[in-house]
């Protein structure tokens, strides 16, 4: 069953309150429509026969509305953790690859890949810690055309939506007409039968990573390893996070603030000659210079007086205000009482007075020979600290042996973590990405159209195929099987 996947970002200041501009609202409503109530069954005439169609709600779609202001207003004592642990949060089976980017732009939030990266970076961060929520429910405007199978059964969902979700051409046109997005955020037209094929590897990537991280977030909370600021936010009732204004709108409660002692930011302390500007320019979505958020008055005063205490005070104030966001702060002399170091200081000095692993003020000191080696090592440390860190929607690539490209013939099993596979040198690729090995794993439930399309796609793969049942294998055993098969060829 087809689905649209939309990710909701929860932060201490917003619980999926969509900021749709006026010129987008009409388009948004034309897609989601409103569910039309009526009888549970519909009698439909087909030539000489009448078929009883049972109205059902699709179970494997992700709602576009999510939890908005009405939910907050109706559940003032609920918390973010109540949503996180909801049994409704299960992964959908398929994804509309072509619509996802447009929906993310329309709602003003990154879709799962971007949001996932954001969440990982902010997991150990401070005030603006964000959380991924996949809210599973049917979008009310979802329309599936009635069809008659061998059992003469018909499934149909009533809706007054003016745009069908399978009409990507219509959505594309409406997007261009009603939004300011260039080229409609990359929407492309495709037939319904093409979607499962084109989205197979994308599903595994996005849903697999998201749900693993999502479950890890909850597990971390239960085991007590969550940083204090995040724990507070997850368990604060909505009535404390939001207040209702005179116009009946739910707005962030500015008087609510996480205790300053719980707010931490990650920092990298770099020595002279390590070229932090190059690191910031290359990975601006991850790193930020400590002075980048200073006001003009603060910058002028610091450059004039060179007062280190004033500098530290400014850094702390901006951390508390959340001005650094979720970025890792590059700083020369961090105020250790108010920020948490990543555990590294890199410098290359002729005498190298600091031995690798030397610890001082909670920060370990290391030495490297060139700025590039320093930058590579820093990325390694961040990758180790945030196990699933994504940069530019791709995992950080480690230097060394080439990753083993593996294609799962019947889709990547959701029981495994794709991040863990890539961390151990196994890259999961799609049908047309020249895999080194194809695993004919336990077959999924496929329609006849899917089987036909998969058969034609597989014929193009020039790689050894190994039949394997992944049902009873753990990650380590599967990795051993893959490496053994590749090593023997």
Curated annotation (Swiss-Prot):
One of its GO terms (molecular function) is RNA binding. It comes from the Viruses. Residues 129-251, 321-351 are annotated as: RNA-binding. GO terms for cellular component: host cell cytoplasm; viral capsid. This is Protein P7. Its main location: virion. It is found in: Virion; Host cytoplasm. Keywords: Capsid protein, Host cytoplasm, RNA-binding, Virion. Pfam families: Phytoreo_S7 (PF07236). The keyword Membrane does not apply. The lineage of its organism: Viruses, Riboviria, Orthornavirae, Duplornaviricota, Resentoviricetes. Probable component of the transcriptional machinery present in the inner capsid. Displays dsRNA binding activity and may play an important role in the sorting of viral RNA and virion assembly. Together with the RNA-directed RNA polymerase P1 and capping enzyme P5, forms an transcriptional complex positioned near the channels situated at each of the five-fold vertices of the core.
């Amino acid at each position: 069953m087809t689905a649209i996947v939309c990710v909701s970002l929860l932060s201490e200041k917003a619980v999926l309150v969509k900021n749709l501009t006026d010129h987008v609202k009409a388009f948004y409503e034309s897609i989601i429509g409103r569910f039309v109530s009526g009888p549970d069954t519909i009698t439909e005439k087909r030539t000489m026969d009448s078929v009883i169609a049972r109205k059902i709600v699709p179970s494997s779609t992700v709602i576009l509305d999510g939890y908005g202001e009405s939910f907050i207003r109706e559940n003032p004592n609920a918390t973010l953790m109540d949503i996180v642990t909801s049994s409704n949060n299960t992964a959908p089976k398929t994804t509309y690859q072509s619509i996802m980017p447009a929906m993310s732009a329309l709602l003003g939030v990154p879709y799962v890949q971007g949001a996932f990266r954001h969440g990982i970076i902010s997991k150990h961060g401070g005030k603006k810690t964000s959380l991924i929520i996949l809210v599973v429910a049917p979008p009310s405007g979802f329309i599936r055309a009635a069809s008659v199978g061998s059992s003469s059964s018909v499934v149909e969902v009533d809706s007054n939506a003016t745009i069908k979700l399978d009409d990507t051409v219509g959505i594309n046109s409406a997007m261009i007409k009603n939004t300011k997005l260039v080229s409609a955020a990359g929407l492309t037209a495709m037939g319904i039968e093409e979607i499962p094929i084109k989205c197979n590897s994308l599903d595994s990537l996005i849903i697999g990573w998201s749900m693993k991280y999502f479950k890890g977030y909850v597990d971390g909370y239960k085991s007590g390893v969550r940083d204090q600021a995040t724990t507070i936010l997850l368990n604060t009732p909505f009535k404390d996070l939001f207040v209702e204004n005179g116009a009946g709108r739910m707005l962030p409660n500015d008087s609510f603030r996480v205790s300053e002692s719980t707010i931490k930011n990650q920092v990298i302390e770099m020595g002279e000659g390590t070229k932090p500007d190059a690191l910031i320019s290359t990975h601006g979505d991850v790193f930020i210079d400590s002075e980048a958020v200073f006001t003009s008055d603060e910058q002028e005063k610091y450059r004039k007086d060179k007062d280190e205490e004033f500098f530290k005070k400014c850094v702390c104030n901006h951390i508390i205000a959340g001005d650094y966001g979720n970025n890792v702060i590059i700083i020369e002399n961090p105020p250790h009482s108010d920020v948490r170091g990543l555990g590294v200081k890199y410098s290359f000095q002729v005498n190298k007075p600091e031995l690798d692993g030397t610890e001082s003020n909670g920060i370990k000191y290391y030495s490297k020979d060139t700025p590039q080696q320093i930058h590579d090592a820093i990325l390694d440390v961040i990758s180790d600290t945030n196990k699933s860190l994504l940069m530019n929607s791709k995992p950080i690539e480690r230097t060394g042996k080439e990753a083993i490209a593996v294609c799962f013939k019947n889709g990547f099993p959701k029981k495994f973590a794709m991040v863990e596979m890539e961390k151990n040198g196994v890259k999961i690729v799609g049908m047309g990405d020249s895999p080194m090995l194809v695993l004919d794993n336990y077959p999924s439930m496929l329609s006849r159209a899917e089987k036909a399309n998969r058969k034609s796609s597989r014929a193009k793969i020039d790689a050894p195929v190994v039949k394997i049942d992944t049902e009873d294998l753990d990650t380590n055993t599967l990795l051993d099987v893959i490496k053994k098969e590749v090593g023997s060829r």
